[in-house]
A protein has these predicted regions:
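Helix-loop-helix hairpins and the membrane-proximal interhelical loops
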Residues: 2-55, 174, 215-313, 455-459
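Helix-loop-helix junctions within the multi-pass membrane cores of secondary transporters/permeases
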Residues: 3-42, 63, 84-93, 97-145, ...
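Alpha-helical membrane-protein architecture signal
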Residues: 18, 22, 194, 276-280, ...
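Hydrophobic/aromatic residues within the transmembrane alpha-helices of Major Facilitator Superfamily
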Residues: 29-36, 69, 73, 150, ...
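Helix-coil boundary and interhelical linker segments in multi-pass alpha-helical membrane proteins
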Residues: 44-55, 94-105, 273-276, 376, ...
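Loop-to-helix transition at the N-terminal end of transmembrane alpha-helices
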Residues: 50-69
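Juxtamembrane transmembrane-helix boundary signature
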Residues: 64-85, 116
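Membrane-embedded alpha-helical modules
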Residues: 99-220, 356-464
Length: 464
């Protein structure tokens, strides 16, 4: 590879990491395209808590920009951040709608969580947790995340749908034909499958940027189907238009003000029991979702050292902690490291230049939101499904000849898609690893911190 001599080389150490400006930018675009859905989904979820939808969109983009820049600067890793899925739903539907708290109080809980994270990062507690997890279990986390994001892609494209009898099932084209919905949800399933096959072909052919090209190919097919009448948008059934909404003319490109949200934190309930419960729930999910993502993506990118440790992890964890605190002030739920970063890593992203590219695109999205919000779930699904495959290959590195290693790894892997949570997968893996190895008399393999984690996980299931 020709050595980069630019300012970017000096800042991001591109040659040292075996990459180039072109590769990093392409990787950043790919990561952003796979996570751009958050710009549409987060406002929809947070508005259910009574928050201004336009303001949430702007705050989401700014939080994504800020967090991802911090990741690039603090750690020089290709990981992107944004308000986390799952945590936003917990914020809106559990804390606000079910528990009856205001969104201002919920933001205060997120802020306090972020401050605690900063302290934990400064005192190396989060880094110690990362290093305490055994290497085989780290590989299992990577494989489990692969299944998890594949499942996200399959359900997002409605290839897999809910079924009252079997919980989930394949999409039924016959039922869609009979119900007259083939041109809404049915055709999008076809397009998603075509996108997966096209992306897989590009991967086999070793075409650079294959994941990004797969997204664009599927999106363009969707546009062609819509303009020819083969695809008929029906938002009530999750079938949205693939065309940018420019009905407001130039005003369509103006970002909404975040004044209804910024600084609106209510600490009046901070001493109550329920506030502590909410805070602990945010803490648990964010700590282990972030650690799981860092473990999985860095393992796939061969960033871990011989002992399974991630160099410069302290900077990555600090970026995540500061971003959460700042995001709460901006008016969004917990800002966290995105598993979709794996898409950019699969495209060759290895440094903070990938993250910086994502950050720039978050800012551009403020002014080009009609285009980014038009990227449909069926177009990003092929990226998630194929990246899921790439991450699942980490399973080949697990020692399945040792049952004390293999069974906890297996439980961690299957828990992630079935529980729809990276954190729960880590929880299952840690608890089973400690119990099985203790009963097998192999306590020398278990670090003291693993025992502590296992007890905390068990208490979490009892108390939260």
């Amino acid at each position: 590879m020709q050595k980069e001599t630019s300012l970017l080389e000096r800042v991001f150490h591109l040659s040292e990491n075996g990459t180039s400006v072109k590769t990093e930018i392409m990787a950043g675009i790919t990561t952003f395209m796979t996570m751009a859905y958050i710009l549409a989904v987060n406002p929809a979820i947070m508005s259910a808590a009574g928050m201004d939808k336009g303001a949430v969109l702007t705050a989401t983009a700014i939080a994504g920009f800020l967090g991802t820049v911090l990741m690039a600067v603090f750690s020089n890793y290709p990981f992107a951040l944004a308000p986390g899925m799952g945590l936003n739903a917990f914020f809106a539907f559990t804390v606000v709608k079910q528990m009856g708290y205001t969104w201002e109080m919920a933001l205060a809980a997120v802020f306090v969580e972020g401050v605690i994270f900063i302290v934990l990062s400064l005192t190396n507690v989060r880094e110690a947790i990362f290093n305490a997890i055994p290497l085989n279990l780290k590989k299992a986390v990577s494989a489990g995340i692969g299944l998890f994001i594949c499942f996200i892609g399959l359900t997002g494209a409605q290839i897999i749908v809910g079924n009252p009898a079997t919980k989930i099932s394949l999409f039924s084209f016959k039922q869609a034909m009979l119900a007259g919905t083939f041109h809404t949800t049915g055709i999008t399933v076809v397009l998603a499958i075509l996108g997966v096959l096209f992306t897989a072909f590009l991967m086999v052919a070793k075409v650079r940027g294959n994941i990004l090209w797969g997204i664009l190919f599927t999106w363009i097919l969707g546009i062609l189907c819509e303009v020819t009448g083969l695809y008929v948008p029906d938002p009530a059934h999750g079938a949205f238009s693939t065309l940018p909404n420019l009905s407001a003319g130039l005003a369509s490109f103006a970002p909404a003000s975040i004044s209804p949200l910024i600084g609106e934190l209510d600490f009046s309930q901070v001493a109550t029991f329920n506030f502590v419960v909410v805070l602990l729930a945010f803490l648990f999910v964010d700590i282990f979702d972030t650690l799981g993502t860092l473990i999985g993506v860095s393992s796939k990118a061969n960033m871990l050292d011989d002992e399974g440790r991630l160099p410069r992890i302290k900077g990555a964890l600090m970026a995540d902690a500061v971003a959460t605190t700042a995001g709460a002030v901006l008016g969004v739920s917990t800002t966290t490291t995105y598993v979709e970063s794996a898409a950019g890593v699969s495209e060759g992203g290895r440094t903070g230049l990938t993250a910086m590219t994502v950050a720039v695109l978050f800012i551009l999205s403020l002014f080009l939101s009609p285009f980014f919000m038009a990227i449909p779930a069926f177009a990003t699904a092929p990226a998630l499904i194929t990246v899921g495959f790439l991450m699942f290959t980490a399973v080949a590195g697990i020692d399945f000849t040792d049952m004390t290693e293999a069974i906890p790894c297996y439980l961690a892997i299957i828990a992630m898609p079935f529980a729809y949570s990276i954190a729960e997968g880590i929880s299952f893996g840690v608890i089973s690893y400690v119990i099985i190895n203790t009963l097998a008399g192999k306590t020398e393999k278990i670090s003291p911190l693993m025992y502590i984690l296992a007890v905390l996980f068990i208490l979490k299931y009892i108390l939260l």
